[in-house]
């Protein structure tokens, strides 16, 4: 009888751990990765964004992390949402992006600092004769605002599936 009880408890614990692990894996994937690039004149910038998995009512995702380079200068970090990059006050950032052919970022845009101590705010300007993307670049002694072309695309990640016995099935692409 004790052996049967032990077996039942160990199976129950295994099932509980399996479901807890499945929930952890599901939450671990609750971010979206994007490839992004922009260029204009002598500016070339590219890298990756990490965003929330959830979209707001306008279809925007919140950017939570950025990596990449601007003209070979490594990006150090994402500038905080709700703040302005130094030299571009009072224009605050919202760090939002969406899947769209035009105006993927807002008029507030996203901002970052570089390893050499410069700051960048890339945004969509709807006040131009022809609406488009712009980059504000600031250093300790300079300020520039130039038009750029911008594109970001979510990275398609393989989906891991298992059959009822827990055996991993071949990956599918979303």
Identify the role of each PLM range:
Residues 16-18, 28:
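Cleavable N-terminal signal peptides
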Residues 31-172:
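Mature extracellular "passenger" or substrate-interacting domains of secreted, surface-exposed proteins
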Residues 13-14, 22, 39:
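Residues at the start of alpha-helices and the adjacent loop-to-helix junctions
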Residues 9, 18, 35-36:
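Generic detector of short alpha-helix boundary/capping microenvironments
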Residues 2-15:
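Bacterial N-terminal signal peptides that target proteins for export
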Residues 3-6, 22, 162:
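Intrinsically disordered, low-complexity Ser/Thr- and Pro-rich stretches
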């Amino acid at each position: 009888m004790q052996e049967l009880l032990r077996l039942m408890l160990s199976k129950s614990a295994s099932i509980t751990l399996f479901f807890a692990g499945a929930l952890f894996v599901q939450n671990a994937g609750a971010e979206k990765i994007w490839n992004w690039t922009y260029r204009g004149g002598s500016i070339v910038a590219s890298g990756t964004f990490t965003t929330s998995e959830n979209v707001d009512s306008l279809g925007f995702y919140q950017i939570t992390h950025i990596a990449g380079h601007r003209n070979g200068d490594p990006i150090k970090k994402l500038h905080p949402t709700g703040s302005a990059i130094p030299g571009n006050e009072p224009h605050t950032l919202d760090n939002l992006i969406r899947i769209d052919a035009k105006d993927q970022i807002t008029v507030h845009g996203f901002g970052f600092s570089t390893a050499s101590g410069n700051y960048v705010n890339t945004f969509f300007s709807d006040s131009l004769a022809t609406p488009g993307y712009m980059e504000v670049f600031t250093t300790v002694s300079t300020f520039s605002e130039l038009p750029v072309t911008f594109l970001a695309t979510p990275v398609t990640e393989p989906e891991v599936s298992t059959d009822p016995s827990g055996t991993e099935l071949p990956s599918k692409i979303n």
